UniProtKB/Swiss-Prot annotation:
Subunit record text: Component of the eukaryotic translation initiation factor 3 (eIF-3) complex.
Official protein name in the record: Eukaryotic translation initiation factor 3 subunit B
Organismal lineage: Eukaryota, Fungi, Dikarya, Basidiomycota, Ustilaginomycotina
GO terms, biological process: formation of cytoplasmic translation initiation complex; translational initiation
Organism for this UniProt entry: Mycosarcoma maydis (Corn smut fungus)
Record flagged with keyword Transport: no
Length: 745
């Protein structure tokens, strides 16, 4: 057995190394095991008043009450724990055990930043986040500056020399952006396979094309249609832009989940967003402004929602506000870009069912842009309605925002339902009131028309005997159209049954009231599509398995004649100018100029003759394309014109001269197309002749090699035999042209 000296090689004292002197932090971090601590339902509230133990019970009860009133969350006093310092005073924060992790997430959303009193404001976090915050480096690291990359011009498509519109077509896995040509097929500008995983959508002004992906939303724009921005909302299925394209709202059926290693930044979700389904984004920067939960059904089953309708947020026309409905309780108005509640509280309205913002007309926009000090622009307005409750009648109310001033209200009786229809220029408001008789056995309809540009908003009532199934204002005019029906099968349609309807046109009479203009009976139409410029309207039958009718009407057909004859019948102005049919039609859309109509049959609805057709404003079919797996076609919207009133008047005045120029260009284009077709035919014919001559030479060479006679001699011999075997039969036909009788003496 060796001695100690031999083992230590003569060293008097063993030189052992202490484990405490070795840094194992990198190894521990690499091989650390994450345990499921089950503390997701525990939150930490900072900013709590410093107290002694004698005041603990009172503080807990106050916090319990605040959670109930502000966040509608029940917490138990027994679930609160507060640490104390050595001097007997609390440390300014408490731990709260919530009933579930979902309640903890809601508490973070609702109570973080809550002002407990003038000196204390809550800061709420998950207990599991404390360790993560503690491990953050205290050394500031300068973020890397991204290299500036200039953007392409986002409205370049408006500079097309021919003034053509664009459209996007989805077919199978391919997405195409194409120019619309009147006399030829769409000219493809951009085409990409698998550009989107579901469908596409244009922004309201046509600046961006939206595509949907599993990881989130992407928007594209510019001459090369490059990606402009990403919005990382996993599973997003619905998108809604604000009118000026400054903001965007997305919805996903999947609750937001934030993993522990999730990136941090203004464009990413944080712990306070967990469990939410709605997200609001700033389009230009991609920053997340706020997220909202969507109330689930009491059953708690996924996908079963109550009180949810799309769009979830409705935008004011100037993008300053957005609002959402809390059914039966209130309307919550939020200011942009902070997305904070207007005046920090919702507008309490008992029983509220629906609301709509008043659009901003051209007059209002011009006034707002001029910003004259002596003329104040019209405030934003919303209209909402409340149903009948006990002895309280139903009510329609117009309110100014942000002042919350009631501008007009009207009581309604025997109301079953209301639909709110603003005129696109904000001149009128039509409330379509579905009413029942006292016995509730039959239904009829009233139109309550508010004149919102007149003092005190006078109301005109238009009474109708039948139920109204569709209503639409003329965009730039004083007409409106509606579809009514007294068919007993209305409301309970069965497969294969077509509902009989009436088409009604109304106009503003010179005496100042709305009167019937013309009625068309025995129709099957169920939808109305006004031209964006007004005057023309398409009436269609959609959703039927038997009828696919399309009808084009002009509501100002006799305008020039009537100008010289004021006594002419106004009903003569409404004229059916075109009819058509698109088998299996599922969608219809006007182009932004009001010159063309696109109808389509999508594979999303059925698989019979999928494709699209292009019509002019008079109902003449210009193109029709049957395409397998066709999904969608959308016109690219255009922004509001940059021409002022005077410039627009000058254009209208010289319209005849411009029309001649356009007609010449159209004729030249058609001539070029015809010439191109002739050249193509001639080229194909020459190619065929060359192939025939080459094949004849090859055949003659082959026959010569085989010792047979030439092709020409063989053909002549065959002709001779055919002539000998042919029997010519002649048949004489006599026809009596005239017959006369003479009597001979």
């Amino acid at each position: 057995m060796p001695s100690v000296d031999e083992i230590t090689n003569g060293v008097d004292e063993l030189d052992f190394v202490d484990d405490a002197d070795i840094d194992f932090s990198d190894i521990e971090q690499k091989y650390s095991v994450k345990f499921d601590e089950g503390l997701d339902d525990v939150i930490v509230i900072e900013g709590v008043p410093v107290i002694t133990e004698s005041r603990q019970q009172k503080l807990f009860e106050t916090i319990q009450k605040r959670f109930k009133t502000h966040a509608n969350i029940d917490i138990a006093v027994e679930g609160m724990h507060i640490p104390y310092a050595d001097n007997g005073e609390s440390k300014g924060y408490i731990f709260v055990e919530m009933a579930s992790a979902e309640d903890a997430a809601q508490a973070i959303r609702q109570m973080d930043g809550y002002a407990f009193d003038k000196k204390h404001r809550f800061s709420v976090h998950r207990f599991t986040d404390v360790e993560k915050f503690a491990s953050l480096s205290e050394t500031y690291e300068e973020p890397q500056e991204e290299e500036f990359k200039p953007r392409e011009h986002l409205r370049s498509w408006l500079a097309d020399p021919a003034g053509r519109d664009q459209l996007v077509i989805c077919r199978g896995d391919d997405v195409e952006i194409a120019w619309h040509n009147r006399s030829s097929d769409p000219q493809v500008e951009h085409s990409r396979p698998r550009w989107t995983e579901s469908y596409v959508q244009w922004s309201p002004l046509g600046t961006f094309l939206t595509t949907f992906h599993r990881q989130g939303i992407q928007i594209w724009g510019g001459p090369s249609c490059e990606r402009f921005m990403r919005f990382p909302h996993p599973g997003a299925r619905l998108v809604d832009f604000s009118p000026s394209e400054k903001y965007m709202v997305t919805w996903s059926h999947e609750p937001i989940q934030v993993p522990d290693n999730a990136p941090i930044g203004p464009q990413f979700f944080g712990p306070e967003d967990e469990g939410n389904r709605i997200a609001v984004w700033e389009v230009r920067t991609g920053h997340l402004l706020r997220s909202f939960p969507v109330p689930q059904d009491e059953s708690g089953q996924p996908g079963q929602l109550k009180g949810f309708s799309w769009p979830f947020l409705k935008w004011s026309p100037d993008d300053k506000y957005c609002a959402r409905l809390n059914p039966g309780q209130a309307i919550s108005v939020y200011e942009t870009p902070s997305m904070g509640l207007l005046e920090k509280k919702s507008i309490k309205i008992e029983g509220v069912v629906d609301f709509e913002w008043c659009p901003m007309g051209d007059k209002d926009r011009e006034l707002a842009e001029a910003a004259k000090p002596n003329k104040k622009a019209r405030d934003n307005m919303i209209v909402y309605w409340q149903p009948e409750v006990a002895n309280q009648p139903a009510r329609v109310t117009v309110m100014a925002v942000p002042s919350r001033t009631i501008l007009r209200s009207k009581n309604l009786f025997n109301v079953s339902d209301c639909k709110l229809h603003w005129h696109p220029q904000g001149d009128y408001l039509c409330v379509k009131v579905d009413r029942h008789t006292k016995t509730k056995k039959s239904m009829f309809c009233n139109l309550e028309i508010f004149r919102v540009r007149e003092k005190e908003f006078p109301v005109e009532v238009v009474e109708l005997k039948d139920a109204v199934t569709a209503f639409a204002w003329e965009p730039f005019g004083t007409h409106f159209a509606l579809i009514s029906s007294n068919d007993p099968q209305l409301g309970t349609p069965a497969s294969g049954i077509t509902i009989k309807t009436q088409l009604n046109f109304y106009h503003l009479h010179p005496k100042g009231d709305f009167r019937p203009l013309k009625v068309f009976d025995n129709k099957t139409a169920n939808t109305l599509f006004w031209s964006p410029r007004g005057r023309h309207i398409v009436v269609a039958t959609l959703g039927s398995s038997q009828k696919f009718d399309l009808e084009w009407y002009d509501v100002d057909f006799m305008h020039e004649v009537r100008q010289g004859n004021p006594s002419a019948d106004p009903a003569d102005d409404v004229k059916l100018i075109g009819t058509g049919e698109h088998y299996g039609i599922t969608d219809l859309e006007w182009d932004p100029s009001g010159r063309y109509v696109a109808t389509s049959a999508s594979v999303w609805r059925h698989s019979l003759e999928n494709g699209f057709a292009i019509w002019d404003f008079k109902g003449q079919e210009l193109q029709k394309h049957i395409q397998d797996r066709f999904k969608q076609i959308l016109w690219r919207p255009r922004p509001r014109t940059l021409l002022g009133k005077d410039e627009q008047k000058r254009v209208r005045k010289n319209l005849r001269e411009y029309s001649k120029q356009f007609e010449e260009e159209d004729a030249a284009e058609e001539s070029n197309l015809a010439s191109a077709e002739r050249e193509l035919y001639q080229r194909i014919l020459e190619e065929w002749k060359a192939w025939r001559a080459r094949s004849r030479r090859d055949l003659e060479q082959l026959r010569a090699d085989l010792g047979r006679e030439e092709v020409g001699q063989s053909v002549d011999h065959a002709k001779k035999l055919a002539e000998e075997a042919t029997e010519e039969v002649q048949e004489w036909m006599e026809e009596i042209i005239e017959e006369t009788e003479e009597v001979l003496a």
